[in-house]
Each structure stands twice: as structure tokens, then as C-alpha cells.
């Protein structure tokens, strides 16, 4: 018995060493569904490029090493990867060895990827173990049949990307060789944490958590890897105090209802989170799986032309955050960097962010939940042909995975599947967009949907527009004039480009795209974008990019910014929120409140005074 205990302790120490602080991004990547027994696979891997896709013929999947070295989870385009290859990468192969602890015997062994752009194939000792389509969603591969506890194995990952095909969402990755305008350095391959974990065969696979503040209860829909003779015990805690508990059969048909007396609600002003523990218990009373989580009780809904949070009108003062980093591109250099971006935004006076053309990692949402920071979830839809049936097939599958992954986060208020779709056809696009809306509602009926931010709306809960008019007086007239709202220009495929203008559609064909009717919230979710750089000569030489003509002085910048926000707030009866472009500069696009290195451009107290203003009726 003593020998067994020592063996277990030794194995746990080994696991602890594998997740030591010298491993990049060593923190647990999924804080809302956390297990104790896991191994972080970040760090140095081997790699090789495969530009002409002959790697399979060359038996790369059977490799035991490659010549190149790369630091995972940073993409090969980034400085932190140690590679910095900036040109297009169609295919890349990764390799490393993995050691399976003996203590994982008789467990299901899962290989988890935070994200790999875009498609991936997984091999263990040369044997195909699984594949995944989609560059932003997390996925797991059950490698139990391919590994042996106590043994070492070779793990090979092939990642492929074809950005210029139009068949995959690129987000803000440049489709040109170099960054240009509002498109930046690409991300290929592994760009989020890779880890292994051991789970009992009857373990908990997922749990959808719905909070009902009107009836003061939490409803949980659990799913298990395999159903059997086991029970699920759920504990809801406020600190160390157990607030509610339930024990039910471990069945996929089970619905758990936890009454919460005197519930503490989550809001930006008071971001309270309950701790939530799941325990799967076998017939002998042993805990065979335990997952630690948390939940924030809050409600978001649309009523008339306003968005409500916890049954009160809530005005959103958002900033556009594209989630790029100078040294990591799509990958934050540290967990602290994720938190710091949120804190900088709040210091500047914003109460949330529209997370733009990138799926942010789960730890970002964790910090948003903890700090009380509103977010909008968005897919990197730019670069894909939204009129293509194949694109619809690819996108719908990945979008489903994203909604399931992030739907339990209280900070996430709005779903935005697509951005600025301005070139619709009259058949596929309306169907695709409406299907996306219906699919999202079926997966998450609790949140409003912004179907195509600033673009051609088809089926949506809120109406959004983008406009970068720099003159405040003109901006006000552009948004709303003579009782009419501006509609984003739509360029219909197969017809001359026509501006729908104010809400008098000029298209007289059989099918007219919808226009705003005043019966839902109207938000300007891209505005501002005022360019400012330290070096005015760089502006004059065209070395920076932004919207409109750059101000000549700091005073001119501040006055323009004040004016833009003032006129939007004056339209509070028509416009229920805004999103300012943007939080930080990104490469050559230099219109952030902060520089790319996160240093402030102006006195933050002054900036905070501007962006912290709110109209009446708004929850402070």
C-alpha cells in the first residue's frame, strides 16, 4: 500500500513539473471547466514547413523529429514562436513526444487543443487519430486507443490553411503577402494551449448552465461521455458556504434545477461569481470525476429599442478589441496580458468590448467575468464567401462549437456571427444568415444576436451600423436625420452597387433586403477610428493607416473625440450604445486609444472622462 501511494505521489510530481512556470502559458486554459489531472504540452516542439503538401508522401506523419524548433502555443509567424516566418504557410507539421502517466491507466485520455488554424490532422506513432476543421474553435481527440500508460509516444500534428480560397474565415489576417490597411500578420497552425487530461469513462463531458434571475434559480443540462450507474453531485458555493446542492442520476436526460435564495447577481458594477463543483460518483460512493467551474447570475434581453441587463436598461460603451499582440500576433504572451487589456479598457472609461474578427481564448472570458467587463462574441468571418454553400457548411459547424464553448460566460452579452457582409446574393446569403440566427438561438436562447455587424441584416435582434465620419455634426446627421436612420450601403451581387441610404430602399426587384424599422435596438458598433501617431512625418508619408484625416494636434484629437461621443449620446432615444474603434493600434492601423505596445497615447483621466459618460436611464 505504501509503495502504491509513493508511486502516485511521484507521478503527480512529474505532472507538476510538466506544468511548471517556465512552460509558456502554463495556466489551465479552460477555467470554467477545470480538472486537476492534466499535462500542459506547451513549450518546444519540432516543426517543418510543407509548402507543396508532399509531407504525407514523405512519411512526415511517422516522424520522430523535425529539424526546426518552435515554441508552442505561438504561431510560426510570431516572434515568440522563435520562427517569424511571415509569408503564406499552406501546411506545417509539428512533432513532440508525450509521456502518459501510469496513473492514467483505465482512464480515457484526451488530447485537447485550444485552437489550430485552420484544419488539423493528429497522428500518434504514425497512426491517424483524428482531424478538425476550423481555426478558432477548441477540440478534443480521444487518444486512448493509441497510447499506453507508462509509455512515451510520438505526437505529430499537421495544420493546413488556404486563406485565399475564400472557403475559410480569415478575420483580419492579410490576404496579401504583407500587412495592409486594416489587415495584419497571419496566424497559422497551433495558436492556443495544447494539453492532455485523464477522464473517467463515465465522466462529465459538458454542462450548459442557464441562469434565471426572475425565478432565482440555475438550470443545468449535463452531458456525459458514457451513461451508466453513477450519480452527479452539484455544489453551488458562495465562498466556502454551500448555497445549493443536488444529486441526480448521471444521465444525458437529466436536468438540474438549483434554487438560489437571495441570489447575488452579476453585473459590471458587481461581478459576483458563484463557485460550482461537479462530482461524478460511482456505485461505491467514489468520486470518479470532478470538475470545478463558476457561474454568474444575470439576464440580458431586448425590450423595444433598448437592451436590458438584469431587467434594467443598460447602455453599452464599448471599444473594438482585435486581440493582436506585437510578439504573439493572435496569442497573448501571458495570462496577465489578457487581464491587462481589460483593465486598460476599463481605465479608459469603457464598460466592455466588441471582440472583433477573432475568437478570444477562454481565459480572456474568465477575466472579463471576474472583472465585470461586457463582451460580444464574434467569428473571424472576413475572407470567406458568404454566398457559398461550402462556406456555409464549414462555418456553421465551427460556429456551433464556439457557441457551445462560450455560452456559460456571464460577461458575453451579444453573439455576432459575421461582420460587414456587403456583397450578398439573393439566394444563398439570406438563407445562410437566417440559418445562422436560428442555429444560434437553438444553442443559446438567452442572448440577443447581431447577425452581420454593420452589414446586410437578414434576421437579427439588434440593428447595427458602421460609420467613420470624422466631423461630429455630419456624423449626427449620418446616423439619424428627419426621423430616418442611415442604412449601411449594400452592394448586391449581379447588380450595380446601390446605397440603400436612409430607410427608403432604392431596390425594386422581387427581393428587398430589410431596412431598420425602429422596433429593435439600434447601435453604431463601429465609429471613431481617429488616427494618431507620434511621428507626424510617418502620417504624411503614408506609413500609417486610419479613418479620415489625422488631427494636427492633441487638442484637435480630443475635441474631435469629444464631439463624436457627445452627438451619439445626444441620440440616446434612437441609438442605444456604441463601439469606438479601437483599443490599441495594430501594426500599420494606428487609431487606437493605446499604442500597439499598450502605452497610452493621451492622458487617461481625460480619455476616461469622455468614454465614461452615459445617457439617462442607463445602469451605471
Predicted regions and their residues:
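Bacterial Sec-dependent N-terminal signal peptides
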Residues: 1-22
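Accessory carbohydrate-binding/adhesion or oligomerization-edge regions at the termini
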Residues: 20-82, 158, 162-167, 239
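Accessory beta-strand-rich segments of carbohydrate-active enzymes
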Residues: 31-32, 47-50, 85, 89-203, ...
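Substrate-binding clefts and catalytic carboxylate motifs of secreted carbohydrate-active enzymes
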Residues: 33-57, 116, 182, 186-189, ...
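Active-site mouth of glycoside hydrolases
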Residues: 118, 123, 132-145, 164-177, ...
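Beta-strand-rich binding/interaction modules
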Residues: 122-124, 217-249, 254-256, 276
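Surface beta-strand/loop "capping" patches
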Residues: 198-227, 614-620
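Substrate-binding cleft/loops of secretory-pathway carbohydrate-active enzymes
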Residues: 429, 453-481, 532, 536, ...
Amino acid at each position: 500500500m505504501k509503495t502504491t501511494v509513493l508511486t502516485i505521489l511521484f507521478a503527480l510530481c512529474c505532472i507538476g513539473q510538466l506544468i511548471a512556470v517556465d512552460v509558456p502559458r502554463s495556466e489551465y486554459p479552460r477555467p470554467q471547466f477545470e480538472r486537476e489531472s492534466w499535462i500542459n504540452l506547451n513549450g518546444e516542439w519540432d516543426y517543418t514547413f510543407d509548402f507543396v503538401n508532399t509531407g504525407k508522401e514523405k512519411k512526415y506523419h511517422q516522424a520522430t523529429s523535425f529539424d526546426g524548433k518552435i515554441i508552442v502555443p505561438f504561431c510560426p509567424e510570431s516572434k515568440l514562436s522563435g520562427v517569424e516566418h511571415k509569408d503564406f504557410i499552406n501546411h506545417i507539421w509539428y512533432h513532440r513526444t508525450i509521456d502518459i502517466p501510469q496513473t492514467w491507466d483505465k482512464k480515457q485520455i484526451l488530447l485537447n487543443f485550444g485552437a489550430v488554424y485552420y484544419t488539423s490532422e493528429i497522428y500518434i506513432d504514425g497512426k491517424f487519430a483524428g482531424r478538425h476543421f476550423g481555426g478558432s474553435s477548441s477540440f478534443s481527440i480521444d487518444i486512448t486507443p493509441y497510447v499506453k500508460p507508462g509509455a512515451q509516444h510520438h505526437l505529430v500534428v499537421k495544420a493546413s490553411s488556404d486563406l485565399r480560397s475564400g472557403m475559410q474565415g480569415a478575420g483580419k489576417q492579410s490576404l496579401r503577402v504583407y500587412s495592409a490597411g486594416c489587415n495584419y500578420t497571419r496566424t497559422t497552425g497551433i495558436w492556443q494551449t495544447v494539453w492532455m487530461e485523464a477522464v473517467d469513462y463515465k465522466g462529465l463531458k459538458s454542462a450548459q448552465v442557464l441562469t434565471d434571475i426572475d425565478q432565482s434559480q440555475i438550470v443545468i443540462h449535463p452531458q456525459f461521455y458514457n451513461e451508466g450507474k453513477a450519480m452527479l453531485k452539484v455544489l453551488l458555493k458562495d465562498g466556502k458556504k454551500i448555497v445549493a446542492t443536488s444529486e441526480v442520476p448521471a444521465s444525458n436526460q437529466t436536468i438540474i434545477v438549483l434554487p438560489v435564495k437571495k441570489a447575488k447577481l452579476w453585473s459590471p458594477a458587481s461581478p459576483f461569481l458563484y463557485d460550482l463543483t461537479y462530482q461524478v460518483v460511482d456505485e461505491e460512493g467514489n468520486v470518479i470525476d470532478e470538475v470545478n467551474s463558476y457561474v454568474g447570475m444575470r439576464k440580458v434581453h431586448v425590450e423595444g429599442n433598448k437592451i436590458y441587463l438584469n431587467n434594467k436598461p443598460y447602455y453599452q460603451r464599448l471599444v473594438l478589441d482585435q486581440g493582436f499582440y506585437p510578439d504573439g500576433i493572435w496569442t497573448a504572451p501571458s495570462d496577465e496580458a489578457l487581464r491587462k487589456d481589460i483593465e486598460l479598457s476599463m481605465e479608459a472609461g469603457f464598460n466592455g468590448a466588441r471582440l472583433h474578427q477573432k475568437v478570444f481564448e477562454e481565459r480572456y472570458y474568465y477575466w472579463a467575468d471576474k472583472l465585470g467587463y461586457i463582451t460580444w462574441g464574434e467569428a473571424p468571418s472576413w475572407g470567406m464567401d458568404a454566398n457559398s454553400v461550402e462556406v456555409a457548411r464549414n462555418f456553421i459547424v465551427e460556429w456551433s462549437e464556439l457557441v457551445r464553448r462560450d455560452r456559460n460566460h456571464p460577461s458575453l452579452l451579444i453573439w455576432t456571427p459575421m461582420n460587414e457582409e456587403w456583397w450578398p446574393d439573393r439566394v444563398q446569403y439570406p438563407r445562410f444568415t437566417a440559418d445562422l440566427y436560428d442555429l444560434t438561438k437553438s444553442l443559446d436562447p438567452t442572448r440577443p444576436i447581431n447577425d452581420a455587424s454593420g452589414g446586410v441584416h437578414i434576421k437579427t435582434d439588434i440593428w447595427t451600423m458602421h460609420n467613420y465620419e470624422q466631423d461630429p455634426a455630419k456624423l449626427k446627421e449620418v446616423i439619424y436625420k428627419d426621423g430616418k436612420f442611415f442604412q449601411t450601403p449594400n452592394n448586391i451581387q449581379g447588380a450595380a452597387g446601390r446605397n440603400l441610404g436612409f430607410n427608403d430602399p432604392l431596390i425594386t426587384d422581387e427581393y428587398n433586403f430589410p431596412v431598420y424599422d425602429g422596433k429593435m435596438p439600434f447601435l453604431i458598433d463601429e465609429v471613431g477610428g481617429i488616427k494618431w501617431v507620434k511621428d507626424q512625418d510617418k502620417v504624411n508619408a503614408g506609413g500609417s493607416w486610419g479613418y479620415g484625416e489625422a488631427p494636427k494636434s492633441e487638442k484637435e484629437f480630443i475635441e474631435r473625440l469629444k464631439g463624436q461621443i457627445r452627438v451619439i449620446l445626444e441620440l440616446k432615444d434612437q441609438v442605444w450604445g456604441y463601439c469606438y474603434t479601437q483599443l490599441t493600434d495594430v501594426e500599420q492601423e494606428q487609431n487606437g486609444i493605446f499604442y500597439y505596445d499598450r502605452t497610452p497615447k493621451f492622458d487617461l483621466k481625460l480619455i476616461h472622462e469622455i468614454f465614461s459618460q452615459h445617457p439617462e436611464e442607463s445602469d451605471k
